[in-house]
Amino acid sequence: MRLKVYKIFIVLFFLNSYSYSQNKVSGFAFESGTEIKLNEVSVYDAEVGLITKTNSIGYYEFTTEKSVITLVFIADGYQFIEKYLSIEFDTNLDIIFSNPIQVLNEVVVKANNKKLFQLSRLDDVQGTAIFAGKKSEVISMDLSMANLASNNSRQIYSQIAGLNIYQNDDAGLQLNIGGRGLDPNRTANFNTRQNGYDISADALGYPESYYTPPAEALKEIQIVRGAASLQYGTQFGGLVNFVINDPTSKSFEIVSRNTLGSNSLYTNFTSFSGTSKKLSYYSFINYKKGDGFRLNSDFESFNIFFNFRYELNNKTSLSSEITYLKYLAHQAGGLSDKMFNSDPFQSNRSRNWFGLNWFLYNFKIKHQFNLNSNFSFNFFGLKATRNALGFRTNRVDQVDSNKERDLIKGEFQNYGLESRFLHKYSLKGKKNVFLIGVKFYKSDNDSQQGPGSFKSDADFEFRLDDFPNYNNQSKYNYPNLNYALFSENIFYLSKKFSLTPGFRYEYIRTESEGFYKKINLDGAGNVILNKTIDDSEIRERNFFLFGLGLSFKSSKAMDFYANISENYRSVTFADISISNPAYSINPEISDENGYTFDLGIRGNYFKRFSYDIGFFSLLYKDRIGFVQKAFKDGSVKSEKGNVGDAVMYGLESLIDFDLNDIFIKNNNLSLNYFINSSFINSKYTESMEPGVKGKKVEFVPKLNIKSGFKFGYKNLSLNIQYTY
């Protein structure tokens, strides 16, 4: 009966004959006097950001529901033009740019862009996604003064509140960010995507992100906090989506950058792009090599990307993408507190290596049925390998024995599809937006652990015949299956107030099939036990997640938002089957679940300063962590398992001041000051482990402050940043 009601509910939405008023704004961009039509002119909504760009004949077009809108037109080499428009019907608006500036001034162009947003937010609806009532942030890469060549995450993400960031290389090979006290390691607590599709090793069993797109290739980075769990996956951290640059409207364009840095750093980024009638493309090659800032931390990386788009007509487009990454990195090893205080650049691991091969593919269809109905289909897949080799022990200050090394090899094969339908409709005179989507995901991954060679090179081959009694040996296959149904609906109760309820249904089936070896030696080093133990497990679960968001936009300068959503994190391969001398695994380890709550206010005050100030809370049940335990053999180790229930809560804020607009008002000048701060408290509220209840949650930074100035004058730009 419930299924029938649900079907009727969906049909009513599809057949709804109401639609709310949408008007088209269109026109041409000209140069004054010459009547030359200008392409690649950016058209911005001052409240939202980039809407569109003029095509090869200088024409632009977009639809809007707004009755009043402030548009900003920006063309390279020209002074920007700002237009206030009152819209009742389809409107034609031609834009005439005055004589071009004789000296192209990049800082002036960036300063014009900053009059819109330095760090913008996602609109209520974008494409086939809903972001109303959610805490969202967008990093515009063309405005960033970060070191893009080295993917410097501390600079790139400096204005994202509450992020804990750490870097272990000076080329940005891997991104390590965690929000609101979550573990930053390989961004595993975020659902990580590129152009809207998954790029992690395994979204369920191994959500770590080994591939990070080069910042030079990015148009923007979209971040949505824990409320993203309903549309993008169940993680507590939320969504990180890397949006690659769009193809140029020119017939052909090549951009090449070469960068030299300390520690023998060399990077090359070369992109190729063009458009010919209905076909467009964008591709890049990125090469990085360096010695690293520590001993034994040299690396070499090669990354290539292709994107092809074909516009079937003005309503339907097809696109396909291929990404390949290969890199080899020397691993310098960890440091104890004593070692770090003595010399933070030292290394006592010369035989540790990490190698990666990453191949991603994607096919996408976008179709607009009419002004109110949009559809998207995403097919994506991954074929990849990772190899970790080295001397591993539970004490980082232990001297390398120069014996056989521990080798862990992983092979990942997965594919999935995600389809979305978004429909705008009216109900009792009020506009609403309905979204429904489905996702299917299947993976078949393999992991093997055993002895590697005793040499020092990056030899990723097992030496089972040479070292048959090596202690850490296992081999597993992980066939996983996941499908999901999700839906959200924006109810605009007034022009200013909206409610957005939603749900996500998940079916997850994770399996492990394999074995591990139990090997015991006597005091003389003789083998007294060498036993192969079969180990297979099936975990099957299905559940609903629910959420509710609200937004009250009292004015252009002020938007109140609140959201509560359920989250879920399944145990990973590493949680259940990888042997580690530093800790053991509790055999009863199980999934985590909980809630994320946001309450905040954000806005842009007359383009003089933008702000986002909010309170958040993460409620964890069965949080996975570590506790010290004594074992029967007399050893004392950390055990990984469900430590208990925990809560993390705090205040986070970002305020960005345009000091030039406030005090100086010089179009040749760019001067900004920002302060990004978060204050977090945490504790375990329940636990079966003695001495845990009431204690602080580990690795949660109480205070996290980033602040900086950004200065630009004509073709000179400088920035300074402080982190505490």
Mark where each language-model region is.
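Short strand-turn segments of transmembrane beta-barrel domains in outer membranes
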Residues: 220, 225-229, 239-274, 285, ...
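Transmembrane beta-barrel wall of Gram-negative outer-membrane proteins
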Residues: 260-289, 294-330, 353-372, 428, ...
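Short acidic/polar hinge/loop motifs at secondary-structure boundaries
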Residues: 63, 197-225
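Extracytoplasmic beta-strand/coil segments of soluble accessory domains associated
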Residues: 127-130, 137-139, 145-201, 219
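Structural signature of Gram-negative outer-membrane beta-barrels, strongest in the C-terminal barrel
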Residues: 313, 431-433, 439-441, 476-619, ...
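Short, acidic, small-residue-rich periplasmic hinge/interaction motif at the N-terminus
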Residues: 44, 74-76, 90-146, 154
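Gram-negative outer-membrane beta-barrel transporters
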Residues: 421, 495, 612-620, 637-724
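Membrane-embedded beta-barrel scaffold of Gram-negative outer-membrane proteins
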Residues: 279, 364-368, 374-390, 553, ...
